[in-house]
Every structure is written in structure tokens, then in C-alpha cells.
């Protein structure tokens, strides 16, 4: 079967999937959890082979250390978290059939705005084998079919998880064709041309990957090109709080797209706060790329100077995805906001301040999908937002923004329920009817639709 035929098959499977009850969709998720638990050792063994090959590539400079970290399924509780993510998605309310607007246009002529699936998704990702399970669970719950294209570095993990999904769906009412998995690099360019069948592309990977996809398809693309997050320490910030937040934002998981890459610090607290913050960071082996003002404060500190170096302009436009942080001194809140809006990636940015007025100004003025006050940027995550898991993070200014859960994979359709009315009966003049446009109580409809 050709690639186009596979995609067409997935589109046909979507037409079945979108009509299944939430009970049938949830049952498929249960089957995936069962298979993940049964085949855990198989999947981790395959992942270990990918890791072995990836480490060799990293040693030869052909693969970044951050990519290797993203690939590892055995670290910490990553596998169990992946399984729990499926259960969390299952526990969420059905995102389909929700009425968000209702009007009675006339007696017996009622209009409803109802949530529905997007259609056939194409998700292209690098490393991160858990994305297969994350996306599959969200797609099934939201009634979408999906074509998944993984990176070559996760080939064996991809194959093992593909077997899990295929086996699970074979025991459910969700068509196996609703989740298609492809690996050949050559197939990406072909997939990007299939706008007749594919409704939305969601890239998860490097800036270059996202830009390449946006430049080479007519299909709408949802995602973010970079995760260049910043923290700003305001003039009234508590030093201990700032140290704690900056440390977590940079070191909790440096390879994550919600880790901070730039620290902005108000000149009023440069001498009082930066030494403590820098000491905390360098104890965690973070290299600090400093502007002249911050460099002057830190260069003679024995505990930190070995990991301090002058910054260059490009550092403030770089997603390091590593234990590296660019530091810049700013004279005011307005200057901090201007820097972030100029150099940031519209992902997630944070202000550390005791002033609600300053925080509100920052959150209103920063052009990002997430703006935080006294909280780590690492919270920008679908699981932490209560979405179960996420399909990705969008910095687009369209229907979905920020961490995307089920809502990001639904759109809406208008349902008009009548009993034979014709448009020519309405208008101005003799014998014409006027529209009533009477609001219908949405709460009552929502309760009925959930039964």
C-alpha cells in the first residue's frame, strides 16, 4: 500500500472514529494502558538500543546531549508517567458534543455551536518516543485520526510502541488505521503535500524542523518554533524566592522547551541579588553568559567565576537546551518587557516581584502564550495544567495556544435543527417573518449532551 493510500485509509478511519461513543474511545485507551504494562520490558529494551546508538552519535558530535536526554524512556519515572498520562486523558470529560452557543432563530429553528474533532492530524517529532503514546491517547479521546512520523534516532522505540498501539486498537472499536505510524525520512515531503486528506500538522522538535515544515506545506501548522523562555527579577523581588525560581527554571530539565534561557535582572538589585542567584546556579554547574554589568559583579567571586563568561548578542536569541543561561541587566520593567517581546519566542515568560501592579503590567504586556508571576516556567505543560498530557505547545495566534490538550484538538460545527423552514420566508416586507434570536440556556443543553 502506498503512503497516500495509508493516509486515505486514516482519513476514512476518522469518519468512523468521530462517531464512536466516549465509552468506546475510553475503552481503547484502557487497552493501550494494558499493552504498555504487558510490554514494558520490550519497549525499554528497544529504547536502550536507541540510547546506545544515540550516545555514540553524541560522542562524535552528530547528536546533541539534549536530544539524547529526550530520547531516554528509562530515566526517573518517565515510562510510568507516560502510562499514567493515558489514564489521565481517559478520566477527562468528553471534549466532543459540547454546546458553547445556542440561539432559537425562530420557533422550531434552533442553532447550536458544538465541539467536534479537527480531522486527520499529522504529528512530526524528533526523539521523545513517549510522544507516540501522548498523541495517540489525545487523538483517540478527541475523535481525531493521526499519522505519526518519528525521528530516526528513536526508530526501535518507535517500532516497539507502534506494536503496542496496533495491538491495543485491534482489541477495541477504534479502527487500527486511525493511528498510522511512518518512519522513513523521505516520506515527510510526501506527507506535507497531502492537504487533500490531512487537516493539521503538529511538529514537535527543533526550530529548524518547525520552520522547514511551515515553509513546505499548504496544510495549517500548529506549534512553536522555539522555547526561548525568560525570567525577569524586578526591583522589589525577594532574593531567596528569585534564587529558587531561577534554579528550577534552568535546571529542573534543561532540555525542555519551558526551561529558561535568559535571566533579566533589574539594575537596582543587581549587586544585592545576582551573587546569590549566580552561586545557586553555578553549584548546579550552570554556565553564565553575562552582559558587562552582570559580569562586573560576578567575575571576582571565586565560587562562580569559573563558570562565568562574557555574552554575545546571539546568546539572547539562543535556545541552549543545556546548563547555560544568558544574563542581561535592564534599567526598568518596560526595558525587560521590550527585551522579551523582541528576543523571546512567545512561549512562556515570568516576572519575579512582590508588586501586583508590576505583575499585572508584565502579564498584560508580554506577547507570549504563557505569562507567570512568581512561578517557574516549568509549569508550562499539559500534564501540569490538568490536561492529562499534551499534544504540544502552541505559540500560534489561532484556536489553540499554550500547552494543548483535548481542547486544542477540537474545533466546532454549527448544527441547525428545524422543521421545514426556508430562508425566503424571512426578511422585511409583507408576509415575511422576522428572526427571534432568542438565547437558549447552554447549561441545560450541556447537561443533556453529557448523558
Swiss-Prot record:
Q: Name one GO cellular component term.
A: cytosol
Matching InterPro entries: Ald_DH/histidinol_DH, Ald_DH_C, Ald_DH_N, Aldehyde_DH_dom, G-glutamylP_reductase_CS, Glu-5-SA_DH, GPR_dom
Q: Cite the entry's keywords alphabetically.
A: Amino-acid biosynthesis, NADP, Oxidoreductase, Proline biosynthesis
The Swiss-Prot or TrEMBL record annotates one GO molecular function as: NADP binding
Q: Give the source's domain of life in one word.
A: Eukaryota
Tell me the SUPFAM superfamilies matching this sequence: ALDH-like
Q: Which GO terms describe its biological process?
A: L-proline biosynthetic process
PROSITE patterns this protein is in?
PROA
**What Gene3D superfamilies does UniProt report for this protein, alphabetically?**
Aldehyde Dehydrogenase, Chain A, domain 1 (3.40.605.10), Aldehyde Dehydrogenase, Chain A, domain 2 (3.40.309.10)
Pathway the protein takes part in: Amino-acid biosynthesis; L-proline biosynthesis; L-glutamate 5-semialdehyde from L-glutamate: step 2/2
Q: What is its EC number?
A: 1.2.1.41
The job of this chain, per UniProt, is described as: Catalyzes the NADPH dependent reduction of L-gamma-glutamyl 5-phosphate into L-glutamate 5-semialdehyde and phosphate. The product spontaneously undergoes cyclization to form 1-pyrroline-5-carboxylate.
The protein here is known as: Probable gamma-glutamyl phosphate reductase
Q: Which organism is it from?
A: Schizosaccharomyces pombe (strain 972 / ATCC 24843) (Fission yeast)
Give the gene name: pro1
Amino acid at each position: 500500500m502506498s503512503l497516500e493510500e495509508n493516509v486515505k485509509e486514516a482519513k476514512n478511519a476518522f469518519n468512523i472514529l468521530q462517531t464512536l461513543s466516549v465509552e468506546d474511545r475510553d475503552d481503547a485507551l484502557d487497552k493501550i494502558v494494558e499493552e504498555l504494562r504487558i510490554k514494558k520490558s520490550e519497549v525499554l529494551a528497544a529504547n536502550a538500543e536507541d540510547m546506545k546508538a544515540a550516545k555514540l552519535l553524541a560522542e562524535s558530535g552528530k547528536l546533541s546531549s539534549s536530544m539524547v536526554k529526550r530520547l531516554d524512556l528509562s530515566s526517573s519515572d518517565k515510562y510510568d508517567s507516560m502510562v499514567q498520562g493515558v489514564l489521565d486523558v481517559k478520566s477527562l470529560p468528553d471534549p466532543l458534543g459540547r454546546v458553547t452557543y445556542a440561539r432559537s432563530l425562530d420557533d422550531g429553528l434552533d442553532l447550536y455551536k458544538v465541539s467536534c474533532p479537527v480531522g486527520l492530524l499529522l504529528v512530526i517529532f524528533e526523539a521523545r518516543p513517549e510522544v507516540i503514546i501522548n498523541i495517540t491517547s489525545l487523538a483517540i479521546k478527541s475523535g481525531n485520526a493521526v499519522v505519526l512520523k518519528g525521528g530516526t534516532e528513536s526508530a526501535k522505540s518507535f517500532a516497539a510502541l507502534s506494536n503496542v498501539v496496533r495491538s491495543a486498537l485491534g482489541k477495541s472499536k477504534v479502527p487500527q488505521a486511525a493511528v498510522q505510524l511512518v518512519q522513513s525520512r523521505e516520506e515527510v515531503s510526501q506527507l506535507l503535500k497531502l492537504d487533500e486528506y490531512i487537516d493539521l500538522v503538529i511538529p514537535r522538535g527543533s526550530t529548524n524542523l518547525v520552520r522547514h515544515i511551515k515553509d513546505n506545506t499548504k496544510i495549517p501548522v500548529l506549534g512553536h518554533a522555539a522555547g526561548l523562555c525568560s525570567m525577569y527579577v524586578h526591583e522589589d523581588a525577594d532574593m531567596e524566592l528569585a534564587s529558587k525560581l531561577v534554579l528550577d527554571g534552568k535546571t529542573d530539565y534543561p532540555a525542555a522547551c519551558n526551561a529558561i534561557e535568559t535571566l533579566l535582572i533589574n539594575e537596582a538589585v543587581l549587586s544585592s541579588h545576582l551573587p546569590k542567584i549566580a552561586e545557586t546556579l553555578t553549584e548546579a554547574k550552570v554556565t553564565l553568559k553575562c552582559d558587562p554589568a552582570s559580569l562586573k559583579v560576578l567575575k571576582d567571586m571565586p565560587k562562580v567565576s569559573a563558570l562565568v563568561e562574557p555574552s554575545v548578542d546571539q546568546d539572547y536569541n539562543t535556545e541552549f537546551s543545556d546548563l547555560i543561561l544568558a544574563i542581561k541587566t535592564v534599567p526598568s520593567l518596560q526595558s525587560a518587557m521590550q527585551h522579551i517581546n523582541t528576543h523571546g519566542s512567545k512561549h512562556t515568560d515570568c516576572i519575579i516581584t512582590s508588586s501586583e501592579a508590576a505583575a499585572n503590567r508584565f502579564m498584560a504586556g508580554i506577547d507570549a502564550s504563557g505569562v507567570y508571576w512568581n512561578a517557574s516556567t516549568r509549569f508550562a505543560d499539559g500534564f501540569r495544567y490538568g490536561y492529562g498530557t499534551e499534544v504540544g505547545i502552541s505559540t500560534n495566534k489561532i484556536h489553540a495556544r499554550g500547552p494543548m490538550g483535548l481542547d486544542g484538538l477540537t474545533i466546532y460545527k454549527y448544527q441547525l435543527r428545524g422543521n421545514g423552514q426556508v430562508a425566503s420566508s424571512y426578511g422585511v416586507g409583507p408576509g415575511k417573518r422576522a428572526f427571534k434570536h432568542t438565547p437558549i440556556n447552554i447549561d441545560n443543553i450541556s447537561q443533556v449532551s453529557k448523558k
